[in-house]
Amino acid sequence: MTAASRANPYSIVSSEEDGLHLVTMSGANGFGNGKVHTRRRCRNRFVKKNGQCNIEFANMDEKSQRYLADMFTTCVDIRWRYMLLIFSLAFLASWLLFGIIFWVIAVAHGDLEPAEGRGRTPCVLQVHGFMAAFLFSIETQTTIGYGLRCVTEECPVAVFMVVAQSIVGCIIDSFMIGAIMAKMARPKKRAQTLLFSHNAVVALRDGKLCLMWRVGNLRKSHIVEAHVRAQLIKPRVTEEGEYIPLDQIDIDVGFDKGLDRIFLVSPITILHEIDEASPLFGISRQDLETDDFEIVVILEGMVEATAMTTQARSSYLANEILWGHRFEPVLFEEKNQYKIDYSHFHKTYEVPSTPRCSAKDLVENKFLLPSANSFCYENELAFLSRDEEDEVATDRDGRSPQPEHDFDRLQASSAALERPYRRESEI
């Protein structure tokens, strides 16, 4: 038996690609993770950037019957054009059905005969053919009431059909109005104004490597009880040899400490601490360039106007995670309020001091981390903003500005810190 014939038919790689699997070995510097890195196999997204799930259902038994059994949900989920077409056809069908019934009643009662040979009152006045019966059906169901045609007491069947058509018309109207209102008020449309950053970043936060991404709300109306979740999705082979194409692993974003619940008034950076329980614990910057996984991020909450739960989704592939970057500030204090500049929402800047090793190596080998007092890009913006406010205040008072005391003090403090890398603002 050849190697090709022994290949697993359910494997995600071919027999030619089987040799590209990662093998373990010790690193040359003793701090490696024991992997030889090969090219990354391109994978399809499970969740698209706009939140849609990249799936297609196939070979579903009795799909039409199951969808028709839940007609209301089907009408809400389908496109507007199809929903309006369905209701238009429903109205036409009911008008035609009752028009035919009124026409049959008129024929059976002899109302279509000439007036000279007819010696009794017709069931429906002014109905002399099918077109007149159809118009009477429309007038009855829509309560137009032109006054030319009306049912008489001559035929109880005609009276009963008028009552039945009125009930059917109310049912169709109620169903249509309910479906349209439910479709217009769907909370998933609220997700269009909830924003995720284009990239996620990995950087140090309080001395620990953290995975971070940013979320924002483009409306002034709040998302009540907003909370976030995240999952890492990647293929996995169990110890028994079972292949799981999309294994879902929860990523902790502070559930135990309540950090997953956010007050989403301004853009917030969501934080996942890469610790021993994290699926990213053994991933370094080099691994990130070759690994194959997807991180699905979910934001849930209630719409303030309707109290209905909405959910916004996005995802980050491994090549969309920037190692050693931080997000640029978007919140600035301006006069008596705070200003949010969304032009910086997706922008990041590089932090050269970020370790390139994994969090596991960082813990085990205890790499030296930069001082907590190191000069930071956000700190520089804060100092510059304060200097501008001081200049404006002194110009307004008509006094000459003081010497650049704060800036000199800043230069003196920053010069005392010997850094082997460039300042973040110079990147």
Swiss-Prot record:
One of its GO terms (cellular component) is membrane. It is a multi-pass membrane protein. A motif (PDZ-binding) lies at residues 425-427. Its main location: membrane. Disulfide bonds join 123-155. One of its GO terms (biological process) is protein homotetramerization. It is found in: Membrane; Cell membrane; Cell membrane, Sarcolemma, T-tubule. The modification S-nitrosocysteine is found at residue 75. It holds the Pfam family IRK_N. One of its GO terms (molecular function) is metal ion binding. A 1,2-diacyl-sn-glycero-3-phospho-(1D-myo-inositol-4,5-bisphosphate) binds at residues 79, 81, 183, 188. This is ATP-sensitive inward rectifier potassium channel 12. It comes from Mus musculus. The gene is Kcnj12.
